[in-house]
Swiss-Prot record:
Function: HMWC (high-molecular-weight cytochrome c precursor), ORF2, ORF3, ORF4, ORF5, ORF6 in the HMC operon form a transmembrane protein complex that allows electron flow from the periplasmic hydrogenase to the cytoplasmic enzymes that catalyze reduction of sulfates. ORF2 is a transmembrane redox protein.
List of residues binding [4Fe-4S] cluster 2: C59, C172, C175, C187
Ranges of compositional bias, category Basic and acidic residues: 345-355
Membrane topology: Single-pass membrane protein
InterPro entries: 4Fe4S_Fe-S-bd, 4Fe4S_Fe_S_CS, FDH_Electron_Transfer_Unit, HmcB, TAT_signal
Membrane-crossing segments per the record: 259-284
Binding residue positions for [4Fe-4S] cluster 4: C122, C142, C145, C148
Protein name: Protein DVU_0535
Origin species: Nitratidesulfovibrio vulgaris (strain ATCC 29579 / DSM 644 / CCUG 34227 / NCIMB 8303 / VKM B-1760 / Hildenborough)
Any Pfam family: Fer4_11
Record region (Disordered): 345-370
């Protein structure tokens, strides 16, 4: 994220005041958005859920999340109430509701609000409400303030506390990439009991009310998420009070941006402090990037030096071998010349040492007649 874009975002958020006068902090957005007309959603019928955790498995595989400590067929994890985290974007919990002789199971994940509190609270606009109904997150814009975690009424966004260098927010995306390919969300596709129904939100609202009307006594006469917090893409049916399955029934119907704008705006603050704090956050981020770049450059430098040293060693070894080979060749030639000279000398000496043949002249020998 470059400095120009960062400061531009600060300007659009109304946080670049340079006069340090007493004022009131404002949320990044105070407007309302009724949602996309033909957006999609999911209806979760908790009366059908059997707590098999197949949805958790599908979510893990589709999003390539880390392997869990307990296998997905290990149902002992249901003995404790869990919440989503950076490595688990959806979880199923078991509840023992009063008056029932069997447990109730409910899947938990991002509800993909029509007017997301996370998007409203995020001053760098790292969250996006998409036309397909999903709410997605762009980690390249995030500065790690975690306002989204505070703003979310459903406690969904999770921070990667275990990541030391580049922690990000993690949450369900409603399988946004799969929707773009015309596929169902992974959890919906794998559910063996059709406890999850995917479709256009307006159709799901109708389906939910039809089930309530056609099955008297089976459901609470309410579709959770139809109106809560201005409405959510993920909605619920239940046979017991929603509070019995850990859901907040006191949220009201006012949209989340109105709540977050009021909450942030109620905090008295010196306006001039915001640029300092946020520029400081930017500086920390840039310093981290600079250190990483320096470490990378140093690693490359060391690698080049090591390669050069290795090449020098190889060259020295080759030259030494060449000198040794040359010396050996000279020694061989000298020895050869000496051997040839010795051989020639010995041949000449042998020739000189041979006796001369007697002369053939017989005149004047005694006893011969004149």
């Amino acid at each position: 994220m470059d400095r120009r874009r960062f400061l531009t975002l600060l300007g659009s958020a109304g946080l670049t005041a340079t006069v340090a006068t007493a004022g009131t902090a404002k949320a990044a957005s105070t407007g309302t958005f009724p949602g996309y007309k033909d957006s999609y959603g999911v209806l979760h019928d908790t009366t059908r859920c059997i707590g098999c955790r197949k949805c958790e498995q599908a979510c893990n595989e589709v999003n390539k999340l880390p392997a869990p400590k307990a296998k997905f067929d290990d149902l002992t994890v249901l003995e404790k109430t869990r919440r989503t985290d950076a490595d688990s974007w959806t979880v199923v919990n078991r509840y023992n509701a009063a008056g029932l002789d069997h447990p109730v199971f409910r899947k938990q994940q991002c509800n993909h609000c029509l007017e997301p509190a996370c998007a409203s609270a995020c001053f760098v606009k790292a969250f996006t409400k998409n036309p397909d109904g999903s709410v997605t997150y762009d980690g390249s814009l995030c500065v790690g303030c975690r306002y989204c975690m505070v703003a979310c009424p459903f406690n969904v966004p999770a921070f990667q506390y275990a990541e030391a260098f580049d922690p990000l927010i993690q949450k369900c995306t409603m399988c946004h990439p799969r929707l773009a390919e015309g596929k169902l969300p992974g959890c919906v596709e794998i559910c063996p009991k059709e406890a999850l129904t995917f479709g256009r939100r307006k159709d799901l609202v109708r389906i939910a009310h039809d089930r309530i009307r056609q099955n008297p006594g089976r459901y609470i006469d309410h579709v959770y998420g139809e109106q809560e917090m201005g409405g959510t893409a993920w909605m619920y049916l239940s046979g017991v009070p929603f509070s019995a399955t850990g859901m907040n029934e006191e949220l009201g119907t006012k949209s989340a941006p109105e709540y977050t704008a009021g909450a942030l705006g109620a905090v008295p603050m010196v306006v001039g402090i915001w640029p300092i704090l946020l520029t400081g956050a930017y500086a920390i981020t840039k310093r981290k990037e600079k250190i990483a770049a320096e470490e990378q450059a140093e690693a490359v430098k060391q690698a080049v030096a090591a390669s050069r040293a290795e090449a020098d060693d190889k060259l020295k070894a080759a030259l030494a071998k060449a000198d040794k080979d040359k010396e050996a060749a000279v020694t061989r030639e000298v020895k050869k010349a000496v051997d040839e000279a010795r051989k020639t000398f010995e041949e000449e000496l042998a020739a000189k040492e041979q006796p001369e043949a007697p002369e053939g002249d017989d005149a004047g020998k005694p006893g011969e007649d004149a």
